[in-house]
Regions:
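Long, contiguous internal "core" modules enriched in hydrophobic/ aromatic residues
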Residues: 2-165, 181
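C-terminal hydrophobic structural anchor segments
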Residues: 156-190
Length: 190
């Protein structure tokens, strides 16, 4: 259960980078050396309210399916057992399909969801399509995301299509790193 639940919850938490979390920051406590904390949860759920947001859950499921895919690719590469490799390829196919569905939902949300933006006068406002605009305003990050996606898909598809091919992790892992870095950059830009 830990192998599925942990990536699901971590992905859900990362989804809050885009949707926000319910906590309050006490700016007066920042300069107070004796203050043990500067932020507190705004409710008694302590962040678990994130699972009530569909985008966060979609993001979490995407991360979970990706983790299972990468684990399958790693084991196919490192364990010399044809019977196990056949079972792992079946798991890889199912989980990659789940990953693609969740990725599509997340990308649709990226194009349409609102995000915090700052106008020329320094005023913060909610901008529709903010993360999509962030992506197209940073062509290097867009290229990084697309290259990562191509590497990931290449690793998975080659492993699924060629029974003798076992090195899909060597494409998928660097692709995952590039795509995830791009997603964090999209969240952090202005």
């Amino acid at each position: 259960i830990n192998g599925c639940l942990a990536p699901l919850l971590i992905g859900t938490a990362v989804g809050t980078f885009f949707t926000g979390s319910e906590f309050m920051v006490n700016k007066n406590a920042v300069a107070d050396i004796g203050a043990p904390v500067i932020s507190r949860w705004a409710n008694n759920w302590h962040g678990l309210e994130a699972v009530t947001n569909p985008f966060n859950v979609e993001f979490g499921l995407m991360v979970m399916f990706l983790a299972i895919c990468l684990g399958s690719l790693y084991m196919i590469n490192n364990i010399d057992d044809d019977k196990l490799a056949t079972q792992l390829r079946k798991s890889l196919l199912i989980c990659f399909a789940g990953f693609l569905v969740m990725l599509l939902l997340v990308l649709i949300n990226f194009i349409t969801m609102e995000g915090f933006a700052v106008d020329t006068e320094g005023k913060v406002f909610m901008e529709k399509g903010k993360y999509f605009y962030n992506l197209i305003q940073m062509p290097a990050v867009l290229i990084m995301f697309l290259l990562g996606a191509v590497l990931l898909v290449t690793g998975v598809v080659m492993t699924l299509m060629k029974k003798e091919f076992r090195r899909g992790i060597w494409f998928a892992a660097p692709g995952t790193v590039l795509a995830v870095m791009a997603i964090f950059m999209i969240a952090g830009y202005n």
